[in-house]
């Protein structure tokens, strides 16, 4: 048997751990909706033909498997959503597409998600987001408020409330 090893690094950020803790304490109320997106632009052209880069194996289904973008970066978005909410995805409806001509596996994908406890979500993953570097973002909304975390600003956690002003926390510098 083959072994698949995957490091889920985004769940180690202090702001992500804070988001998870606040949801576990019920601060957002009953969760309703999750939006998680992972946007990269490095495969917006067929650079795998140039050689000497990671695109070669990532876009070759014989070497990477049949799941392109959704398997490469969508898995990180999926994990982040389940980690922070503490809920498992029970159902999904996905749409995968290879936009770059001649690419044999998906370079873009989206999925509607149904989590436990009747929470719904949307996951998008793309490697054809021209101009993007490595941008993962999650927003989670409950009946009392919502939160947002972006990997491009990893120490910042934004909390939005129904009945009070938005809070912007600088978590990486507050004793974590």
Regions found by a protein language model. Give the residues of each.
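Predominantly a Rossmann-like dinucleotide-binding segment in NAD(P)-dependent oxidoreductases
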Residues: 2-5, 10-103, 157
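C-terminal glycine/acidic-rich active-site capping loop/insertion
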Residues: 83, 91, 110, 115, ...
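Glycine/proline-rich active-site loop of Rossmann-fold NAD(P)-dependent oxidoreductases
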Residues: 87-88, 103-105, 119, 132-136, ...
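Glycine-rich phosphate/pyrophosphate-binding beta-alpha loops
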Residues: 75, 101, 124-132
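Substrate-positioning beta->alpha
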Residues: 76, 103-110, 115
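Beta-strand secondary-structure signal
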Residues: 35, 110-112, 120-124, 137-139
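Beta-strand scaffold of nucleotide-dependent catalytic cores
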Residues: 31-34, 122-126, 149-150
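Glycine-rich Rossmann NAD(P)(H)-binding loop
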Residues: 97, 124-128, 141-144
């Amino acid at each position: 048997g083959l072994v698949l090893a995957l490091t889920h690094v985004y769940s180690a950020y202090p702001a992500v751990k804070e988001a998870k803790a606040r949801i576990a304490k019920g601060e957002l109320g009953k969760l309703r909706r999750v939006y998680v997106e992972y946007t990269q632009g490095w495969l917006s052209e067929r650079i795998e033909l140039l050689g000497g880069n990671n695109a070669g194996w990532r876009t070759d289904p014989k070497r990477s498997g049949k799941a392109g973008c959704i398997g490469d970066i969508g898995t990180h978005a999926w994990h982040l959503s389940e980690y922070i909410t503490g809920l498992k995805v029970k159902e999904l409806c996905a749409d995968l597409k290879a936009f770059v001509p001649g690419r044999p596996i998906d370079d873009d994908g989206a999925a509607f998600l149904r989590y436990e406890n009747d929470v719904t979500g949307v996951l998008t993953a793309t490697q054809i987001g021209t101009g993007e570097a490595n941008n993962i973002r999650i927003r989670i909304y409950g009946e009392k408020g919502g939160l947002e975390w972006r990997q491009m600003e990893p120490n910042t956690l934004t909390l939005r409330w129904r009945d009070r002003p938005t809070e912007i926390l600088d978590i990486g510098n507050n004793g974590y």
